[in-house]
Amino acid sequence: MLKQEVTSLKNYQIQCPYCGAKAVLRSANKVFGAKTREANRFLYVCSNWPSCDSYVMAHMEDHRPMGTMANGMLRHKRILAHKALQAYRKATHTDKWASYIWLEGKLGLDQQRTHIGMFSDEECDRVIALCRKEIAISKQNRMRGVS
């Protein structure tokens, strides 16, 4: 039944930015193993996987890619950028929506492009640096009693 559901959804044509091979939609179990918390999810995986370790998670409802394909180093950098943005939200008491609007302005990107899953290594570095700077300013303001 699951196979029928997968084939009935739109098929996205994605090419690996690292080796140029076609990406294929696979169960997360095939990449992460059966005991993953992503067990019911799907990924677009480079057809040269595992020698090319590029993949991107797919949305559950329609299997749209959640960003661009990334190798292990870029996926790690995106995780760090997400963590930095979460720390920024916590330090500045900002909700997720407002933090992305802030990020749009800081990066000079539009709403469609302001998703960490679409960011390059350099953009992730900028997010991390911007968040650290704002967290430091917020901390200084709290210490001085400025809100």
Residue spans for each PLM region:
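Long C-terminal interaction/binding lobes of large macromolecular proteins
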Residues: R132-S147
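Non-catalytic, well-ordered alpha-helical scaffold segments
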Residues: N40, W97-I101, D125
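Extended interfacial segments that mediate partner engagement and assembly in macromolecular machines
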Residues: E61-W97
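Amphipathic protein-protein interaction modules
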Residues: A84-L85, A91-H115
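N-terminal cysteine/histidine-rich coordination modules
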Residues: M1-E61
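Chromatin/DNA-recognition segments of nuclear transcriptional regulators
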Residues: R113-K133
